[in-house]
Amino acid sequence: MQTHTRLLDELCHLTAQSLASLETSDHFQIIKLLGEGSYGKVMLAMHKKRGTPMALKFFQRDSTCLLSFLREYNLSLAFCTHPSLTSALGIAFSTPTHYVFAQQPCIYGDLYDVIIPEVGMEENRVQQVASQISGALTHLHSLGFVHRDVKPENIFLCDRDCRWVKLGDFGMAKAVGTRVQCIWYSSPYCTPESKIARVTKKIDSGCFEVNNNGNKEKVHGEKPEKMYCTVDPSTDSWALGILVYAMLTGNHPWSETVSDNVAYKRYLQWRKWGISVSEKIWSHQEPSRFMKFTPLAASLFRSLLHPQPKCRGRPEEMGEFLGGAWLMDQKKV
């Protein structure tokens, strides 16, 4: 794994030395917008000389660190050889306003647009996607990298029926074991171990800090403390579990992964006691959102959504859960 991270660093160094400055319109015919986000945008384009269709990913220079751009490009170019990972095409350049690299085009949009709210997707399609994304994550993990941002918006379609999908957007990807700032955010995709980032540290009122004007001022009250955690593949396992739930139901299992969230608390009880006991627990309450699943799917969720990262299931185990029914017959629920 360390060999792969060293190779990535070397590739970034070499690319930085050879990164050309080009005018996009001189070499590419822009066809249409494929997507956009906080980083910039992705455009479908045609290479004028080769006649090759490709997706050009534009990163705004004023808000993008060059090293971050180089790492995403080279990770996609050198390591994303799995058929369900988007691969770069060996073209990277800069313009006065953007850093740009070319990648395989996925012209049918992303998975977010396929999932019908409150309904989800057909179960066979869900299993198709789950199989492909688990394979993509297994490949990344075997090389020592963690995606860290698995969600429907980052899964791209190569056809309308989800027979072939690709996991993309490696801007958050890091090597296993890297120390990063732990960030908690209000989302089911946020892992339970990220709750440490909500902790605040009391600052002694006698301390001083430098304000925006460069002057020292006394600090009072509480100040958030930066917390750090180690990058681990279990983060992707958790996201994979939430993704499967979203595809099956068109909903999220809970709004945020915190112990005082009612839906998450009920999940923990359901996970601990099982379906039969859950029926008694919720006989006079809203039933668990996980009681609609077959025992096979229930086992999958218990594995991927284990609250303890060391006990969490791995993407390569997905094959054990494929082929059987995941949703109960609604007439029997």
Q: Which stretches of residues belong to each language-model region?
A:
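Juxta-kinase regulatory segment immediately upstream of eukaryotic protein kinase catalytic domains
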Residues: 1-23, 31
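Conserved N-lobe ATP-binding subsite of Hanks-type protein kinase domains
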Residues: 41
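Conserved N-lobe beta3->alphaC-helix segment of eukaryotic protein kinase catalytic domains
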Residues: 58-79
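Short beta-strand micro-motifs within the conserved protein kinase catalytic domain, predominantly
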Residues: 87-99
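Conserved short submotifs of the Hanks-type protein kinase catalytic core
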Residues: 96-110
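Activation segment signature within eukaryotic-like protein kinase domains
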Residues: 129-130
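Catalytic-loop of the protein kinase fold
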Residues: 141-158
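Activation segment/activation loop of eukaryotic-type protein kinase catalytic domains
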Residues: 158-207
